[in-house]
Each structure stands twice: as C-alpha cells, then as structure tokens.
Amino acid sequence: LRELMQARVPQMVEQLGEFVNLESPSLDVAHLQHTAKYLADLFADVTGKKAEVIPGANGPHVHWKGSDDTKVLIVGHHDTVFPLGTTSTRPFSVEGDIARGPGIFDMKAGIVQAIHGLSAISDSSQVEMLITADEEVGSYTSRELIESRARATGAVLVLEPSADGGALKIARKG
C-alpha cells in the first residue's frame, strides 16, 4: 500500500494544486459549487464511483458511499476562511516536499489524500465520506446531515489537521 500511495504522489500534488486554486470561501455559494463539482469529479476519477452533490443553503456538500451498508464516516469540508482573490497573491506552490496555498492545511490536502486512500484499500464498501461546505462558519446547514450519517455509521473520522506539535485532535473545543 505504501508503494502504491508513493507512486500516486505526483498525481495527488497536481490534483491538490487544482483544488487549492479553486477558491472556496465560506458562504460564497457560486465558488463552493465549483469546488463541489471538482470533488465529485475527483471521486469518480479516482475511485470509479459516483459522489452525490447535496445542495445546501451555504453551499453544496459532497457525499460518497462505498455501499449501502457503511460502518465508518469520514468527514471533511471544502470551504475555507480565505477571501476570494487570495490565490492571486498566494497561489498553490511546491518547494521541495512542502506544498503551500490557501486551505491546504485545513483541509484540502487531507481530502485529496483520503480520496486516494479510499481507492487504494482493497475494500472500501463499509466507508463513506462527507465533505461539507460550511464548517468554517459553524456547520449550520450541514449539522443535521453530519449527525444523521454519524448515527447511521457508528464511527467517525474527521480530517481535521493536527494540533501544534502534531498532536491528534480528539474533541471539538467549546
């Protein structure tokens, strides 16, 4: 599996660059529609399975299921805190082993890696992934969907980046 994923790094970096340069500020529904479509297409290209784009008042969410009998939910978000136009001064870039750009850390890189990870495991039938459009503004329109899918699966992995020093986040603050 390690060799397979290592071989995919150039493809993942290219896809990450496309995703980062598609700006997705919270509450900018038009731009969030573009990133939702990009993610749905990426799911299809990488996994061979179709993802559903679910309309939301604050922007569309993207939902992919390995089957109708999933046990694990992976949650992420495609909205960012960066205002429209940020990529004109801070576009995606790679220097050595470091990629930079708006939204890369929270959480566009994790989403690209997770999609590739799902396609690389021999059986992803018990996994589903939900990428929401409003996490940075409180998840008000996605909360019910997240809670419903979490109850249905029973186990949830959130793609939130590590805390300072690489510590694993195990709870939501507040």
PLM feature spans:
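Acidic/His- and Gly-rich active-site-bordering loop/insert found
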Residues: 1-104
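Acidic/histidine-rich catalytic neighborhood of metal-dependent amide-processing enzymes
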Residues: 107-174
